[in-house]
C-alpha cells in the first residue's frame, strides 16, 4: 500500500496540471465533447482500451494479466455547472458562465491517475477494472444510459469519490446507509381565466392559486410527514400573468423534492399532486403536475464501506463515518441499485486556502489540489483490493 501511495504521490504535478486543464475548459452535461476527447487521450497514453457510450460518456476497460477474476467499476463524473467563476487564479474557467464548481474536474483527474497507476500493475491482478467517466450528473441524465448499456453487468463492486469541502483535506468520509437524498423535479401548470383586475369575480386568478399552493406545499413537510424523517419541498420559480392590470390566466411553479426513502418519494408526489388539484379547484381553476426522476436516494452498502475503510487505513488516510446527511442528490445512487458499492467523500478543505472551505455550486469554490494523489490512490487501491483480496492484507 505504501508503494502504491508513493506512486500516486509522484504523479502530483501531473495530476494538478491535468485538473487545471479540465478546470479551464468546463462543459455542461451532455456537451462534454472536449472533456471526453481529453480523457480518451489519457487512456490511450496508458494503453487502456476505451469506448464511447452515447456522445460523451467514456468507458475504459483494463484487463489484468495476473491470477483471479471479477469486475470492479470505478466512476467519476465529468460535467460542469452554469456558474460564473469569480476566483482570480491562473486556471480559472475560460468559458463565460460555466465552471467546475462541484469538483468534477478533480474526480476525473483522480480516476485518470488511478488508471495510470493500475495500468502499470496489470500483472498484479486478474479480471477487469472498468473506468466510467460519466457525463450529465448535474442534470440526472448520466448514470442510467451507462446502466442500460450494460456497463454494470457482472460487476462485483462499484466505487466512486466526491470532493468534500466540509471535511479536512487528506481525510475520507465513508458512511454506511443513507448519504444523499433522492431528487425529483416538478413543474405545476395552473389554468385560470383572465379578467380585468377591477373585476376579479369574473376571472379565475392563477397567480393567487399559485401563491396559495407555494405556502400549502410546506404544510406537507410540517403536517403530513414524520418530523424525524428528512424531507424537503422547494419551489424556485413562479411565473404568472401577462399584464399588471389583468387577472393571471396561467401560472407555472417549478421546484424539487428531496427525500431518503421510496415511501417518502411516493408520498410527496401523491400529496403535491392532490394539493395542486384541490387548491386550484377551490378557486375554479385546474392544474397538472409533471415529474422528472433525477436521482434515487444514495444508500451505501455497509460491508463495502468497511472494505473502503480498511483500504484507506492501509494507505494511511484517516476516515470518518460522521458526515451529515446531504439533501443534495447524486446519480451514483443508480449504480448502487445494480450492485454492491460505496460512494466516499474526499476531504479537500484546507483553512490556509479559504476558498477550499467554501461549499460547492458557488463561483468562488475551489479544492486543495494536494489531495488529488490521495484520491487516485484510493481509487486504485480499492480496485486492487477487490480483484486481489491478498493485496490489502
Protein language model regions, located:
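Non-cysteine beta-strand/loop elements that form the S-adenosyl-L-methionine
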Residues: 73-75, 84, 186, 343-349
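Acidic/His- and Gly-rich active-site-bordering loop/insert found
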Residues: 2-100, 105, 109-125
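General structural feature for long, well-ordered alpha-helical segments within catalytic domains
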Residues: 11-18, 31, 35-42, 70, ...
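Histidine/acidic-residue-rich, glycine-tolerant segments that coordinate divalent metal ions
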Residues: 81-83, 87-99, 105-106, 111, ...
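Divalent metal-coordination and catalytic microenvironments
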Residues: 22, 60, 74, 104, ...
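Metal-dependent amide/peptide-bond hydrolase catalytic core
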Residues: 211-393
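Active-site beta-loop-alpha junctions enriched in small/polar residues
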Residues: 27, 77-79, 136-138, 164, ...
Amino acid at each position: 500500500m505504501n508503494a502504491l501511495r508513493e506512486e500516486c504521490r509522484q504523479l502530483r504535478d501531473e495530476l494538478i496540471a491535468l485538473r487545471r486543464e479540465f478546470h479551464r475548459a468546463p462543459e455542461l452535461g451532455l456537451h462534454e465533447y472536449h472533456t471526453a476527447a481529453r480523457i480518451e487521450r489519457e487512456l490511450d497514453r496508458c494503453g487502456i482500451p476505451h469506448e464511447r457510450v452515447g456522445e460523451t460518456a467514456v468507458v475504459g476497460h483494463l484487463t489484468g494479466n495476473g491470477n483471479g477474476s471479477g469486475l470492479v467499476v470505478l466512476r467519476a463524473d465529468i460535467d460542469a455547472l452554469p456558474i460564473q467563476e469569480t476566483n482570480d487564479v491562473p486556471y480559472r474557467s475560460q468559458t463565460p458562465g460555466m465552471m467546475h464548481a462541484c469538483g468534477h474536474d478533480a474526480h476525473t483527474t483522480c480516476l485518470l491517475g488511478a488508471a495510470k497507476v493500475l495500468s502499470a500493475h496489470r500483472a498484479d491482478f486478474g479480471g477487469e477494472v472498468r473506468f466510467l467517466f460519466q457525463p450529465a450528473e448535474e442534470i440526472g441524465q448520466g448514470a442510467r444510459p451507462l446502466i442500460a448499456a450494460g456497463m454494470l453487468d457482472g460487476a462485483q463492486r462499484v466505487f466512486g469519490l466526491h470532493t468534500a469541502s466540509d471535511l479536512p483535506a487528506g481525510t475520507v468520509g465513508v458512511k454506511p446507509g443513507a448519504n444523499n437524498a433522492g431528487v425529483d423535479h416538478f413543474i405545476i401548470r395552473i389554468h385560470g381565466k383572465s379578467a380585468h383586475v377591477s373585476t376579479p369575480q369574473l376571472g379565475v386568478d392563477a397567480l393567487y392559486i399559485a401563491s396559495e399552493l407555494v405556502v400549502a406545499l410546506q404544510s406537507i413537510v410540517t403536517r403530513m410527514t414524520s418530523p424525524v424523517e428528512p424531507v424537503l419541498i422547494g419551489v424556485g420559480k413562479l411565473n404568472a400573468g401577462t399584464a399588471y392590470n389583468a387577472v393571471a390566466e396561467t401560472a407555472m411553479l417549478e421546484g424539487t423534492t428531496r427525500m431518503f426513502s421510496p415511501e417518502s418519494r411516493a408520498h410527496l408526489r401523491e400529496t403535491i399532486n392532490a394539493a395542486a388539484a384541490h387548491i386550484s379547484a377551490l378557486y375554479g381553476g385546474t392544474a397538472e403536475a409533471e415529474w422528472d426522476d433525477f436521482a434515487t436516494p444514495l444508500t451505501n452498502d455497509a460491508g463495502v464501506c468497511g472494505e473502503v475503510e480498511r483500504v484507506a487505513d492501509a494507505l494511511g488516510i484517516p476516515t470518518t463515518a460522521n458526515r451529515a446527511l446531504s439533501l443534495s442528490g447524486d446519480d451514483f445512487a443508480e449504480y448502487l441499485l445494480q450492485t454492491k458499492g460505496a460512494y466516499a467523500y474526499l476531504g479537500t478543505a484546507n483553512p490556509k486556502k479559504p476558498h477550499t472551505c467554501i461549499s460547492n455550486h458557488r463561483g468562488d469554490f475551489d479544492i486543495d489540489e494536494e489531495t488529488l494523489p490521495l484520491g487516485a490512490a484510493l481509487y486504485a487501491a480499492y480496485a486492487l483490493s477487490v480483484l486481489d483480496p491478498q493485496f490489502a492484507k
